[in-house]
Amino acid sequence: MTRHLTLCFILLIILIDKSEACFCDHYPWTHWSSCSKSCNSGTQSRQRQIVVNDYYRDNSCDQLCTKQETRQCNVETCPINCVLGDYGTWSDCDPCIRKQVKVRSVLRPSQFGGQPCTEPLVTFQPCVPSELCKIEETDCKNKFLCDSGRCIPSKLKCNGENDCGDNSDERNCGRTKPVCSRTYTPIPSVQLMGAGFHFLAGEPRGDVPDNSFTGGICKSVRSSRTSNPHRVPANLENVNFEVQTIEDDLKTDFYKDLATIGKNKNEDRSLSGEKKDSFYVPIFYSSKKSENFQRNSGFKNAIEASHKKDSSFVRIHKVIKVLNFTMKTTDLQLSDVFLKALIHLPLEYNFALYSRIFDDFGTHYFTSGSLGGKYDLLYQFSRQELQNSGLTEEETRNCVRYETKKRFLFFTKTYKEDRCTTNRLSEKYKGSFLQGSEKSISLVQGGRSQQAAALAWEKGSSGPEANVFSEWLESVKENPAVVDYELAPIIDLVRNIPCAVTKRNNLRKALQEYAAKFDPCQCAPCPNNGRPRLSGTECLCVCQSGTYGENCEKRSPDYKSNAVDGNWGCWSSWSACNAAYRRSRSRECNNPEPQRGGQRCEGKHWQEEDCTFSIMEKVGQPCISDDEEIKEVDLAEPEADSGCPQPPLPENAFVWNEKKLYSVGEEVEISCLTGFKAVGYQYFRCLPDRTWRQGDVECQRTECLKPVVQDVLTISPFQSVYKIGESIELTCPRGFVVAGPSRYTCKGDSWTPPIPNSLSCEKDILTKSKGLCQPGQKQSGSECVCMSPEEDCSSYSEDLCIFDEGSSQYFTSSACKFLAEKCLNSNQFHFVHAGSCQEGPQLEWGLERLKLAMKSTKRVPCGYDTCYDWEKCSAHTSNCVCLLPPQCPKDENQLHCVKMGSSMRGKTVNICTLGAVRCANRKVEILNPGRCLD
């Protein structure tokens, strides 16, 4: 019996195999077609070369064989070449530097492997000025004026020391007496403490304070490494030597990707050092305050390494200090080259000339810090191999720390981590966890370059020698760097030179414009939510965890997200200064916009700051120095025994021909600032007794200033001033509502109703009550029940205009009450429009729309509203959006005979077309329901 069953089974397999065993490779594939795109992910296809014969039919090849295949090709993002704008016209000839300049800007940085820009952005030429230079000579008063422009105490002249920096204080001197009774050696590497620091590039620049200046003082400090004391420069408040190597301060950090390193740290600090500055960027402190090293040149190497493989990173770092220093807070002597650069700046603002200060000397200087070195390595690991190792993030950090201490630092306090040698990754490399990394990237500071470079390694190499750390540590003593520093803006040092106030203001303006050139908002969006980073005129993509490739275009198998996070576009230009002496600018979250559930941009979408404007004729920049309280109208007062001084002006008023003294009989016209109008007699006359004949006049407000509200609130429309009768609407982010009225109207000189300073956003009562229920419902136990308009809607929610079908009346209701009433009486209440009910086109169309809706065959809930045949629901705004007439289907639902515009003939349209035409605000007359009669 068993034998017969086996035989039957074999015969069945043969029959099945014969009927369904088509060998598809019998029909070869064609070659792949050419790619549909040369970049940005195209497709290509191929087909089987089918021959329909008996074999094809008998073996069901038509059903079993795939006849066509497609695949992606050229997935690389299209390269974007760098584009420069044309040079502008030559500037006016500056009378102080006798040069003129023309500039051009980078219209588009290179990205995705595009051609870089190599041509200069600025060009200069000598010229002959037509005006005199207004910059005054340096007034040292009772001090000695050096040729460089530096002022030094007179007692320092002819003391045998180069206190001027250019030796001009030691010319024509007879015998000199030494200042100090003995010879001192300078503090090693003291010049490093006086270097400028370019925050945006992350590197030191030219000397700013002059730390060779001793000021005739013989203050000294001793080092345990040398027998002779060192003379302390006058700029230094405090110096103390130390060699500090603490074993327990070796730190490790784990990063899933480079995009998370230093993200948005210390954003409350401003680039210029002013709390209310308009351009905010994180100021980092080498290791005291933040571990942000994104601006280190090694970070670019890390970005390029991350493009080759989906990676995670472990950073291990340690600071070794040789000495600590603190600079004085006032009266710093500037270096000769920095001082000359400041003195030679033009009085008129010129970005090209002022921005060279930041190129040459950086944006900041060191106020305190340490000289020494920083052991700083960034290990790159394959993310897949780390996952397969079975180690947690904390265990990964501990293993890097443990092996570094054991192999390179030879610290005695090393606690063995068993899992560091027995995990899957270490076992592949003879128990070494570090050997399992792809490479280590050197972010080392200080020491000789040869020893610093030897600390890093790459996969496949033998790795650093065991004594490489001790050799580097020894070299740090002779070649230190500034570590653990604090910074201050170099603009603060622009003092005690001619026109210092004017030049400081120009430098602040230039710094804002200069910093904007480092903003990655100029870059195109990177694939897969990569973060763009602007390096010079090239944009790089910093890949998110799970992505890699030259432009982050490749995905790991476990990266499934299709969400696109939002990123900020560039700031707009500043608005004109308004009557409240404020100006503003804005930006949009559109580079790209959030899509498919992606995150919205973090931060402010608009900024405001104080500003000034001139009411006088523009006659060039005034030269304002530190010791002068000079304004634009401060002119030399003529000596005269007749005439009138400036007249007393009403509040918010000015006169166009303002001056110190007016002649007898001269008249002035009283004008009002923007947003005010003069009421009364506007003309004052100067009388012989040096008084003014004047009538009653005042400046009354005719416009409302844009209200100052909390950052979370958005004002629409956004203007500097609003005319009487104009209204604004305040809105909150999705899921929140204004905690009070949202609509305000300019009436007289104030807003109605008054806008409280405490006005903010609160969680939408509808969102809080909803849970898993529909709008207008709340969760009660495991059930959803209708909300009570009286009990559940006491908190504020936005106003809506509602139509009551029962009474045929429209009224203003809160959104909460509307949804609650609609839940209780589902067909009685209808949404008309957002905001309170006010007579006008919006209300008229809303009521007409409800009449048309009675004939609609489509009813789709959409936010507070219901969309009908001629509309679609916007998922982004939860509002009904009208279709264009050509977008309507060509069906015969609810036909009407209508007359459109000036046409005399009737036309048959369906309900969708009728609603779409009316929504477009075109005139339509309904002649009769159904088709038009011929």
From Swiss-Prot:
Residues 766-840 are annotated as: Factor I module (FIM) 1. Ca(2+) binds at residues 156, 159, 161, 163, 169-170. Membrane attack complex (MAC) assembly is inhibited by CD59, thereby protecting self-cells from damage during complement activation. MAC assembly is also inhibited by clusterin (CLU) chaperones that inhibit polymerization of C9. GO terms for biological process: complement activation; complement activation, classical pathway; in utero embryonic development; innate immune response; killing of cells of another organism; positive regulation of apoptotic process. Residues 22-79, 81-134, 565-612 form the TSP type-1 domain. Residues 642-701, 702-763 form the Sushi domain. Residues 858-934 are annotated as: Factor I module (FIM) 2. Pfam families: EGF_C8A_B_C6 (PF21195), Kazal_C6 (PF21288), Ldl_recept_a (PF00057), MACPF (PF01823), Sushi (PF00084), TSP_1 (PF00090). Its main location: secreted. It is found in: Secreted; Target cell membrane. GO terms for cellular component: extracellular space; membrane attack complex. Glycans are attached at residues 29, 32, 38, 90, 324, 392, 568, 571, 574. Component of the membrane attack complex (MAC), composed of complement C5b, C6, C7, C8A, C8B, C8G and multiple copies of the pore-forming subunit C9. This is Complement component C6. It comes from Rattus norvegicus.
